[in-house]
């Protein structure tokens, strides 16, 4: 089968960069002194029997982070960043993720085999420990997975003389594997990052520093007698089967190679069902990167893989791969600043890269990547191992690694309410994604702008929008809650108290109502908006001018407006989920407190500098505005934004206390009388709501409530209620909501938590 020169035949407009990617990252858990953590795998990470994203490798303290399939290298790194964030915040706060491939100083007896449920997996790890030793098992790395794009493969297939797609793909991936092993030394030279081993790691003295112990025969490799041919797929499959039959290997996965064929459960299935993708297993962790691999490395490797396809396959495969192994060993164990040996043929690599970039018209970015490769070939100072040299102290990188680990740990806990890499999404959705990853529920973002997610476990699929809009609420329930008039009628029919008032569809109608309310405390609000938009509250009778302004503000948000009686008391938000109150929040209206020096405008700016405050529901607290509503509120109190408040003087900028309009959040779940929680849950149930925010005005929360004597008034029901404000509060312990959403949607996962 002719596979050589196929890329050269493709049209320049062919989708040469089309591919799917996945990353697996191993990392040890250590304490703040850089010693191995002896705690079990975190129970909050769910059952390892099915977790798709966070597993343990050989050791109980060796985490393995696995991304979903991504359509770009950028997306793969984004996935890995989020999973790393979840892992970093799921382990103990006193634990860190070790950023090096080589472990800290360890003793063999410290290493505990992963405590897995699967009996074979436990037996397999004990077997490996006995055969290869335990310390080698603590070496960690990155596995880079790539599947050539469907359209790219089809274009290559059309240029070939083949009629069998499976056979063609097998030949294509076999050629790529052959050339990858032939030129494996390129990866070791450019990206090797294991220059030293900590004291007593090896039983014998070894010269150091080197480029990569992990990628040499000092790393985790098979016994020398295990020699598997890549000359053909049949040879590969048969050789491994023979070693297993003879007892030299216990399982197919015990054959360790820098590249592994993937996509089938057993190797022999590759012959008739085909190779789906390749796993490249020889990447050291890059300690300069929080997630262990940089964007430029991901893209450079992608370009190199295409160059390996551009190059012809070796004529004598076994001989070429043996030479490639010997060269890789020499380069791996050479000093990081030692130039490449003469037998390292860099010219054919750089020529292939140049021709590839030129043929397909790749732009400045990829041309820059090629230049970086050329620069590194010419000067080893540009390699990763060389960059680590200044950080080696007394033949150790332990201090450097611990410093990096602490830095990355602190980053994980900075803005800990957000999911790293997904900060532009709505905050409740970020929190739900965090919990989904933590619990081991598969996720796909169907529409990032619309906050629309697909979640699944095995065959069970759920769709979630905006964090808590699910199939559990029928279509009409959010529509009813969006219409405040309908909400009031349903609650009234169910016997629950609501404010008296009327509805208007024009400014003229609203103004005509003024004589009836001119001496009353009132609330003016849009009929069908959420998040406190367009609401004005008058605790003192409103002038006609101010009343008109309030109507105009409300009509700017909706075509219909409600004017209701103002109910005195304290407003609380009750979060109801599936008929149960899960959280109660006291919300304090947007405010500033004077210091006798700064204007109200300056005080607002100071308060907005709080890192918990942001915009568009992506932070636990919202930025405080100084718009029409706030300035009207100031006018009613006799102030302007440029007035200086006396020290200790508190001024509210809003009557309504919504967090979404700059208010502060106080969690009172534990102190709120259960009777009010039950009453709020009953109100949500009367609407048929699964997830619902119930706003109650309570004059005296020390008086127990009942349906007959509620001692409160429901001023609003909210569909798609915010969840973040209950979890990350200005005061109080906070209540986790998103995890309970997932437990309700996937009870089978909740019951499998470790």
Language model region names:
Residues 96-102, 317-323, 561-565, 572, ...:
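A short glycine-rich, hydrophobically flanked beta-strand micro-motif that places a catalytic Asp/Glu
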Residues 634, 658-671, 685-689, 698-754:
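C-terminal active-site "lid" helix and adjoining low-complexity regulatory extension at the edge
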Residues 8-10, 105-106, 116-134, 138, ...:
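Loop-rich catalytic cores of soluble enzymes, especially ATP-dependent carboxylate-amine ligases
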Residues 414-482, 486-489, 508:
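ATP-binding N-terminal substructure of ATP-dependent carboxylate-amine bond-forming enzymes
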Residues 247-259, 301-304, 308, 553, ...:
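A long amphipathic alpha-helix within ATP-dependent nucleotide-binding catalytic cores
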Residues 1-129, 136-138, 175:
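Terminal catalytic/cofactor-binding subdomain
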Residues 463-469, 473-623, 673-677:
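Active-site nucleotide/adenylate-binding loops and adjacent lid/helix of ATP-dependent enzymes
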Residues 1-37, 41-54, 323, 327-438, ...:
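Sequence termini and other peripheral, non-core segments
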């Amino acid at each position: 089968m002719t596979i050589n020169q196929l890329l050269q035949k493709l049209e320049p407009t062919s989708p040469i960069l089309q591919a799917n990617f996945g990353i697996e990252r191993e990392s040890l858990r250590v304490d703040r002194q850089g010693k191995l953590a002896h705690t079990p795998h975190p129970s909050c990470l769910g059952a390892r029997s099915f977790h798709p994203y966070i597993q343990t490798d050989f050791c109980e303290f060796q985490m393995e982070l696995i991304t979903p399939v991504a359509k770009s290298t950028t997306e793969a790194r984004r996935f890995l960043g989020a999973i790393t964030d979840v892992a970093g915040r799921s382990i103990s706060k006193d634990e860190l993720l070790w950023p090096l491939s080589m472990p800290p100083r360890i003793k063999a007896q410290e290493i505990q085999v992963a405590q897995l449920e699967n009996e074979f997996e436990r037996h397999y790890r004990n077997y490996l420990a006995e055969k290869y030793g335990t310390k080698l098992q603590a070496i960690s790395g990155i596995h880079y997975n790539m599947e050539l794009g469907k359209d790219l493969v089809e274009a290559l297939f059309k240029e070939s003389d083949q009629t069998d797609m499976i056979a063609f793909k097998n030949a294509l991936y076999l050629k790529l594997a052959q050339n990858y092993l032939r030129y494996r030394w390129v990866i070791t030279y450019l990206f090797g990052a294991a220059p030293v081993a900590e004291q007593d790691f090896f039983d014998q003295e070894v010269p150091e520093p080197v480029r990569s112990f992990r990628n040499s025969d000092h790393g985790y490799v098979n016994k020398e007698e295990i020699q598997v041919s890549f000359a053909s797929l049949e040879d590969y499959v048969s050789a491994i089967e023979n070693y297993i039959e003879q007892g030299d290997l216990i399982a197919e996965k015990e054959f360790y190679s820098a590249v592994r064929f993937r996509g089938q459960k057993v190797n022999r299935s590759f012959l008739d069902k085909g190779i789906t993708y390749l796993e490249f297993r020889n990447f050291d962790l890059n300690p300069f990167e929080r997630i262990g691999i940089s964007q430029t490395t991901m893209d450079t490797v992608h370009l190199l893989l295409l160059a390996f396809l551009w190059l012809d396959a070796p004529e004598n495969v076994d001989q070429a791969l043996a030479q490639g192994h010997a060269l890789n060993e020499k380069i791996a164990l050479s000093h990081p600043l030692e130039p490449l040996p003469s037998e390292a043929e860099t010219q054919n690599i750089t020529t292939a890269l140049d021709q590839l970039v030129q043929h397909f018209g790749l732009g400045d970015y990829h041309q820059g990547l090629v230049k970086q490769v050329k620069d590194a070939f010419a000067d080893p100072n540009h390699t990763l191992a060389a960059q680590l040299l200044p950080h080696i102290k007394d033949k150790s990188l332990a201090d450097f690694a611990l410093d990096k680990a602490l830095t990355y740990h602190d980053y994980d806990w900075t803005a800990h309410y957000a999911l790293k890499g997904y900060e532009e999404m709505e905050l409740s959705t970020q929190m739900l994604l965090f919990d989904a990853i933590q619990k081991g529920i598969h996720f796909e973002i169907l529409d990032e702008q619309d906050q629309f997610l697909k979640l699944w476990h095995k065959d069970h699929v759920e769709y979630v929008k905006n964090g808590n809009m699910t199939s559990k609420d029928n279509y009409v329930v959010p529509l009813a809650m969006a219409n405040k008039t309908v909400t009031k009628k349903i609650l009234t029919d169910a016997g629950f108290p609501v404010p008296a008032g009327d509805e208007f569809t024009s400014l003229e109608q609203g103004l005509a109502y003024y004589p009836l309310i001119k001496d009353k405390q009132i609330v003016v609000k849009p009929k069908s908006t959420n998040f406190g938009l367009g609401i004005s509250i008058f605790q003192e009778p409103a002038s006609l001018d101010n009343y008109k302004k309030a109507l105009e503000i409300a009509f700017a948000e909706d075509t219909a407006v409600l004017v209701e009686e103002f109910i005195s008391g304290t407003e609380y938000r009750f979060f109801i989920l599936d008929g149960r109150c899960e959280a109660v929040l006291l919300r304090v209206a947007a405010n500033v407190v004077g210091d006798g020096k700064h204007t109200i405008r300056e005080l607002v700016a100071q308060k907005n500098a709080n890192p918990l405050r942001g915009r568009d529901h992506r932070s636990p607290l919202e930025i405080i505005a100084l718009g029409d509503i706030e300035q009207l509120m100031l006018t009613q109190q006799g102030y302007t934004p440029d007035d200086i408040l006396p020290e200790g003087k508190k001024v509210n900028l809003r009557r309504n206390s919504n967090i979404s309009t700059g208010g502060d959040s106080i969690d009172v779940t534990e102190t709120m009388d259960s009777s009010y929680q039950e009453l709020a849950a009953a109100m949500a149930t009367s609407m048929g709501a699964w997830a619902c925010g119930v706003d109650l005005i309570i004059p005296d929360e020390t008086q127990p409530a009942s349906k007959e004597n509620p001692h409160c008034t429901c001023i609003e029901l909210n569909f798609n209620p915010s969840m973040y404000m209950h979890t990350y509060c200005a005061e109080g312990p906070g209540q986790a909501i998103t995890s309970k959403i997932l437990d309700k949607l996937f009870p089978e996962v909740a019951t499998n938590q470790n």
